[in-house]
């Protein structure tokens, strides 16, 4: 164990494989310094689908845009299984790194690789077998069906690359390195945009070209980050003595990963159900929502991944037993999130129409109006989703991932129930779907903060 600890600490002193401890130093600057590369990286990650949406919407038309936009929602739901497993494993890595137990960290790396690798394979098989029933369940219109099916077949053929990138990104962030994932993602984003233009404009491959561009870019980021991480961080290399499926390690990884996976899956299943309701309103609403939700996701992405950085901060300090530092960190995170969300809310409300015009030609007035309405309703309440991301990260980090699932069920349950109820009322329609989303956010916030005040504020020992 001592050798493992010295290896990483020596790398820190040499500055080659830089990691960042969040258990000492100024809390505000430490959290922001660690969060910025994560925020930039995940803003860049949005370009994977935004590049497809922008180019497809401009050059292939509304039907292709509706196909790619709806496919994105399904992709997020299905890949949330992998992302949840990676995030759950990352919490365990952070706790063990905070406690400086590097032998346990290596065992966890092996167990999580086996668990997530097998899950990736099973998910791939499931998509190829059940893609048609899934699309039928989503009520995908006939004019969009084949385009969406072709896009998804290609995307999920490369899902292993998505696993590689997110796994090693989670591992690196757990030990305090949020820069390397950003570097490899930036390369992939540039490649994705270039290949989009080549495959769609030069080769005429249509929606399939957009899918291939994304898969190739993900392959570069996933394989590249994997090999570079193993090269630069010897402690990530697993030896034969670490290849032990000890029950305690398996249980810890499986518990965190499965609950985080459940949270991500519930979250995206709810979104998928709302997408099915939106699809029933026709191609114009689908296209308007597809463009607007990209802008929406891009706008609140910084607070989503600030929440992940906050979770790493909490986990490292929880592992190190620094509970008072955790309480101070909570106050800092709440203030930072509120300030950022207020700024973004004003910008999105004012710039909603110009932002829609980036994706949709000016003559498509109905689609633009639908998107503007969505953005102005959601954008006014970003602080609700910002605080919810903090709650998710907090409860994962203090060994209560089940509470994150409860909050997700509340948020998404309210959203789905209200959306279907209000949309059926004459004169409300799609407007009711838009309003159901922030209402779900705030009800989950209230429950999560009340639970913290009753239980967690008194003691961080569960």
Language-model features and meaning:
Residues 86, 154-173, 181-189, 210-225, ...:
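Short runs within selected transmembrane alpha-helices of multi-pass transporters and secretion channels
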Residues 2-35, 93-158, 202-258, 314-381, ...:
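Short alpha-helical transmembrane segments in multi-pass integral membrane proteins
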Residues 77-80, 192-196, 222-226, 298-301, ...:
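Hydrophobic transmembrane alpha-helices of multi-pass small-molecule transporters
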Residues 62-73, 152, 211, 283-298, ...:
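Small-residue hotspots at the loop-to-helix junctions and early N-terminal turns
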Residues 65-125, 162-181, 288-352, 385-399, ...:
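Small-residue-rich hydrophobic transmembrane alpha-helices
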Residues 32-52, 154, 165, 188, ...:
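Transmembrane helical elements of multi-pass membrane transporters/channels
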Residues 47-66, 135-142, 198-205, 265-294, ...:
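Helix-terminus/linker motif at the lipid-water interface of multi-pass membrane proteins
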Residues 22-60, 73-88, 92, 117-124, ...:
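N-terminal transmembrane alpha-helices
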């Amino acid at each position: 164990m001592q050798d493992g600890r010295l290896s990483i600490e020596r790398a820190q002193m040499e500055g080659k494989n830089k990691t960042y401890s969040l258990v000492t130093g100024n809390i505000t600057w430490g959290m922001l310094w660690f969060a910025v590369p994560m925020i930039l990286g995940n803003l860049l990650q949005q370009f994977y689908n935004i590049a497809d949406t922008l180019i497809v919407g401009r050059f292939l038309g509304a039907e292709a845009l509706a196909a790619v936009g709806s496919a994105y929602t399904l992709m997020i739901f299905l890949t949330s299984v992998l992302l949840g497993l990676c995030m759950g494993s990352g919490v365990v890595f952070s706790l063990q790194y905070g406690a400086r137990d590097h032998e346990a960290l290596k065992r966890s790396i092996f167990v999580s690789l086996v668990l997530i690798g097998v899950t990736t394979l099973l998910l791939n098989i499931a998509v190829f077998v059940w893609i048609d029933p899934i699309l039928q369940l989503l009520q995908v219109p006939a004019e969009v069906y084949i385009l969406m099916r072709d896009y998804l077949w290609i995307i999920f053929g490369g899902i292993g690359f998505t696993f590689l990138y997110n796994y090693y990104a989670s591992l690196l962030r757990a030990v305090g390195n949020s820069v390397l994932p950003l570097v490899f993602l930036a390369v992939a984003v540039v490649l994705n945009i270039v290949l989009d233009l080549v495959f769609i404009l030069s080769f005429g491959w249509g929606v399939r070209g957009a899918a291939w561009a994304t898969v190739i870019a993900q392959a570069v980021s996933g394989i590249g980050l994997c090999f570079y991480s193993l090269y630069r961080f010897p402690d990530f290399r697993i030896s034969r003595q670490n290849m032990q499926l000890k029950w305690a390690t398996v249980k810890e990884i499986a518990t965190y990963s499965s609950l985080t996976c459940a949270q991500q899956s519930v979250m995206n299943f709810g979104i998928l159900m709302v997408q099915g309701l939106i699809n029933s309103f026709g191609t114009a609403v689908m296209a308007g929502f597809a463009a607007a939700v990209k802008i929406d996701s891009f706008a609140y992405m910084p607070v989503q991944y600030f929440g992940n950085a906050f979770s790493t901060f909490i986990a490292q300090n929880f592992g190190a037993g620094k509970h008072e530092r955790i309480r101070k960190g909570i106050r800092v995170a709440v203030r930072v999130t509120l300030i950022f969300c207020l700024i973004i809310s004003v910008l999105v409300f004012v710039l909603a129409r110009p932002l829609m015009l980036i994706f949709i030609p000016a003559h498509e007035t109905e689609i633009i109006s639908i998107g503007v309405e969505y953005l102005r309703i959601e954008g006014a309440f970003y602080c609700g989703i910002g605080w919810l991301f903090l709650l998710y990260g907090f409860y994962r980090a203090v060994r209560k991932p089940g509470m994150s699932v409860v909050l997700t069920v509340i948020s998404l349950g309210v959203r789905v129930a209200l959306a279907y109820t209000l949309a059926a009322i004459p004169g409300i329609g799609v407007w009711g779907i838009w309003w159901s989303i922030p209402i779900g956010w705030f009800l989950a916030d209230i429950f999560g903060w009340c639970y913290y005040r009753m239980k967690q504020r008194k003691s961080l020992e569960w």
